[in-house]
Regions:
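Short acidic low-complexity segments
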Residues: 35-47
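Charged, amphipathic alpha-helical segments and their flanking helix caps
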Residues: 1-36, 58-159
């Protein structure tokens, strides 16, 4: 059976993405202060920050049904900028990204009770799909990036 793929609208992507971003900002993660969360852009290259970045060109509908319902995948990056001046700091730098993956897994097993999705969105999976890796190192600061993905069912017109 062939899988039919279509891109999500930017409006739907943002509507669902905002639910996930709001959930992440409320999480208690060691060494991550609420003020460190950024959306799309980091504001400094000298202080620790965690940034959520949309990947809208990879968000897509899978297998749309006759009444308009479909399964969708919504990928996003989380980038963590932190000091890498010591070997110990470098070893600990992926901890927040790994903790986020664990929190997402817990939320999934609890039927997404803490994330407020619109009524027509039925979340199925929220998981890390690409493990953290370093993307840059400059002036003792490094950025580690991991990719996560939400899979959900969008209800059709008569569901």
């Amino acid at each position: 059976m062939e899988i039919k793929r279509n891109k999500l609208t930017f409006e739907e992507y943002n509507r669902v993405f905002e639910c996930i971003y709001g959930f992440m900002k409320k999480l208690e993660i060691p060494n991550i202060k609420k003020s460190m969360w950024k959306l799309e852009f980091m504001t400094s290259s000298k202080s620790d920050q965690i940034m959520v970045q949309r990947v809208s060109n990879r968000a897509e509908k899978l297998n749309e049904n006759i009444i308009g319902g479909y399964t969708a995948v919504l990928p996003f990056y989380i980038n963590y900028l932190s000091s890498a001046r010591t070997e110990d700091a470098l070893l600990r730098i992926t901890e927040p990204l790994d903790i986020l993956a664990k929190k997402f897994e817990e939320e999934m097993h609890n039927n997404f009770i803490s994330i407020s999705f619109p009524d027509d969105i039925v979340p199925q999976r929220l998981e890390m799909v690409v493990n953290p890796g370093s993307t840059t190192l400059e002036n003792g600061m490094t950025v580690f990036t991991a990719m996560y993905q939400l899979t959900y069912y969008k209800k059709g017109a008569f569901e």
